């Protein structure tokens, strides 16, 4: 088992920063690890016209923020396209006309290549656990197909308790293990932050790997240090090495 999947309780909860934290933490344990974002959407800059005109081109430009963060998080020499199968301008290509261009065979090949090259691959989803991946499959369906264990990124905000418990429940009902969850503080002004963490810890059987505070430009910082559950990280490292 060389791969695991990072899902989130919603969009915008910090899946990529949590993935960065896991990559950095496992690298400190001498694990050769890379991130993989199968489908990225919503670029920072407009795509070029010639890219839009080419129906075979899955890239408007190689500037999706999430993919770039994953690329910069690993110590391995990987290109943008090594760790991303599709980048789209549209924010939700899975439910637009673009969905017909997403071929899971390509995603599977890209994942297999990474898994054959590196010790561990951290696969980051898009949107939430049950979000569509293409015309036929959800991300959950695809993860079940590959029998990947799951880590849940929880953006700590109003409503996150319900979102987190539903996500964990769905993952477990589909027969996959939850290796742990990460609390990512996305609202510095949220009241009862500590109480929310306590409730989640009491309701989620999987261990809390760590709490990432609200910090400026986390994509440029060592966020792996916030994953303080080293015992569970060692367990994950051992499990993935089998």
Curated annotation (Swiss-Prot):
GO terms for biological process: biotin biosynthetic process. Keywords: ATP-binding, Biotin biosynthesis, Cytoplasm, Ligase, Magnesium, Metal-binding, Nucleotide-binding. ATP binds at residues 12-17, 66, 184-185, 213-215. It is an enzyme of class 6 (ligase). The keyword Cytoplasm applies. InterPro entries: DTB_synth_BioD, P-loop_NTPase. Its main location: cytoplasm. It is found in: Cytoplasm. Its EC number is 6.3.3.3. Homodimer. PANTHER family: DETHIOBIOTIN SYNTHETASE. This is ATP-dependent dethiobiotin synthetase BioD.
């Amino acid at each position: 088992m060389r791969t695991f999947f990072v899902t989130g309780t919603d969009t915008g909860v910090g899946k990529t920063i949590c993935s960065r934290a896991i990559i950095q933490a496992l690298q400190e344990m001498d694990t050769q690890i890379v991130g993989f974002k199968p489908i990225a959407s919503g670029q920072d800059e407009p795509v070029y016209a010639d890219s839009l005109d080419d129906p075979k081109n899955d890239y408007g430009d190689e500037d999706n923020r999430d993919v770039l963060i994953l690329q910069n998080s690993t110590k391995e020499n990987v290109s943008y396209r090594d760790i991303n199968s599709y980048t789209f301008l549209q924010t939700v290509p899975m439910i637009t006309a673009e969905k017909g261009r997403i071929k899971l065979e390509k995603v599977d090949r890209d994942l297999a290549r990474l898994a054959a090259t590196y010790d561990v691959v951290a696969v980051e989803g898009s949107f939430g656990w049950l979000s569509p991946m293409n015309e036929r499959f959800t991300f959950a369906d695809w993860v079940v197909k590959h029998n990947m264990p799951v880590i849940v990124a929880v953006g700590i905000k109003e409503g996150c308790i319900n979102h987190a418990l539903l996500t964990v429940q769905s993952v477990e009902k589909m027969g996959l293990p939850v290796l742990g969850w990460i609390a990512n503080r996305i609202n510095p002004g949220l009241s009862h932050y500590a109480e929310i963490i306590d409730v989640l810890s009491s309701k989620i059987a999987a261990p809390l790997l760590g709490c990432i505070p609200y910090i400026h430009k986390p994509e440029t910082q060592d966020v792996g240090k916030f994953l303080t559950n080293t015992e569970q990280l060692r367990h994950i490292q051992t499990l993935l090495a089998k």
